[in-house]
Amino acid sequence: MTPHINAKIGDFYPQCLLCGDPLRVSYIAKNFLQDAKEITNVRNMLGFSGKYKGKGISLMGHGMGIASCTIYVTELIKTYQVKELLRIGTCGAISPKVGLKDIVMATGASTDSKTNRVRFLNHDLSATPDFELSLRAYQTAKRLGIDLKIGNVFSSDFFYSFETHAFGLMAQYNHLAIEMEAAGLYATAMELNAKALCLCSVSDHLITKEALSPKERIESFDNMITLALEMMS
């Protein structure tokens, strides 16, 4: 047990899917897993363990932003011995290469947060995912006929107050989208010798101002959930 997770040791499987929204975690448990069991609920940040095609897998919410995400990731790795962490979330596209409903695989994560500089003695850390997880995601997407969009993301500490004038520069440097956690997830996994990857479904396009309806968001997210579970099974 930790200050933020009240699961017992052994409740988490070595592979864990992460979502910012705990209700999305509950949705996955109820609609995609067999024998799903709630294992933690501190602060209503829900976690579950269950089976997908006979293989054990866990789910955990992590809240919004790098600070919240890294708390849960650290505790999952250090206390519960989770080895592979796959974040599945939403993002806002900033590149013409990406459209609504596309799934982005973050091969690197830049950030305006100072957390990684503090972690890395004020140097620039190359926050990258695990190669083997990335390869599995790519191969699984090919098998499922999913056109995975591959490139960098920008993990921002800001949801509302953001430097919109920088979108063009980010796109020039092959940043496909903006989200809020990948840079912290990758850095924490690197520090603690675990494997991590971030997949994001495009729910909004910050340049064209297009956005999915609530129904379309659910349908789009279901495709990413299937990809995530298939690559972990």
UniProtKB/Swiss-Prot annotation:
One of its GO terms (molecular function) is purine-nucleoside phosphorylase activity. It catalyses: a purine D-ribonucleoside + phosphate = a purine nucleobase + alpha-D-ribose 1-phosphate; a purine 2'-deoxy-D-ribonucleoside + phosphate = a purine nucleobase + 2-deoxy-alpha-D-ribose 1-phosphate. Its EC number is 2.4.2.1. The record marks R217 as: Important for catalytic activity. GO terms for biological process: purine nucleoside catabolic process. The active site is at D204. GO terms for cellular component: cytosol. Pfam families: PNP_UDP_1. SUPFAM superfamilies: Purine and uridine phosphorylases (SSF53167). Phosphate binds at G20, R24, R43, R87, I88, G89, T90. A purine D-ribonucleoside binds at H4, E179, M180, E181, S203, D204. Belongs to the PNP/UDP phosphorylase family. Homohexamer; trimer of homodimers. HAMAP family: Pur_nucleosid_phosp. Catalyzes the reversible phosphorolytic breakdown of the N-glycosidic bond in the beta-(deoxy)ribonucleoside molecules, with the formation of the corresponding free purine bases and pentose-1-phosphate. This is Purine nucleoside phosphorylase DeoD-type. It comes from Helicobacter pylori (strain J99 / ATCC 700824).
